[in-house]
Amino acid sequence: MMKTVTIDLQIASEDQSNLPTLEQFTLWATNAVRAEHFEPEITIRIVDEAESHELNFTYRGKDRPTNVLSFPFECPEEVELPLLGDLVICRQVVEREAQEQGKPLTAHWAHMVVHGSLHLLGYDHIEDDEAVEMESLETEIMTGLGFEDPYSYDEE
């Protein structure tokens, strides 16, 4: 049976309107992680563009805010902790992208949580074959949650 992901939700955004609920974040992360043998924990921090920009520059060398940053927790092998890591999601970027792509806002929030959670599990999209695998898994998870394929909007 799939274990529920415990979410530590931190809201560091001045505007807290139109944010998903803790229950929504939990549902989306749980469906992405699909843990069966442990009860994972993820911190989700909702930030404004200034914090996203600073973190994106510090950790990725990108001089702009981004939609989601993933910080996997690296635990020594001899220590068993259920912490998967942290997701930092920029509210303004998510809202802007949803509007630009013609996506429902809730669907884009869900996609960012699924996408970031998969990064915490070690998935990546740097190489083409990795991107195909990760995007396929994202689509499977999102449609399983009742959303449309998140990449179908990019083609319109």
UniProtKB/Swiss-Prot annotation:
SUPFAM superfamilies: Metalloproteases ('zincins'), catalytic domain
Annotated cofactor note: Binds 1 zinc ion.
Subcellular location: Cytoplasm
Cofactor: Zn(2+)
Domain of life of the native organism: Bacteria
Free-text function comment from the UniProt entry: Single strand-specific metallo-endoribonuclease involved in late-stage 70S ribosome quality control and in maturation of the 3' terminus of the 16S rRNA.
Any Pfam family: YbeY
Annotated Gene3D superfamilies: Metalloproteases ('zincins'), catalytic domain (3.40.390.30)
GO biological process, any: rRNA processing
Record-linked PROSITE patterns: UPF0054 (PS01306)
Gene designation: ybeY
Binding-site list for Zn(2+): 115, 119, 125
Enzyme type, top EC level: hydrolase
Protein name: Endoribonuclease YbeY
Organism, as annotated: Mannheimia succiniciproducens (strain KCTC 0769BP / MBEL55E)
An MF annotation (GO) of this entry: metalloendopeptidase activity
Record-linked InterPro entries: MetalPrtase_cat_dom_sf_prd, YbeY, YbeY_CS
EC code(s) of this entry: 3.1.-.-
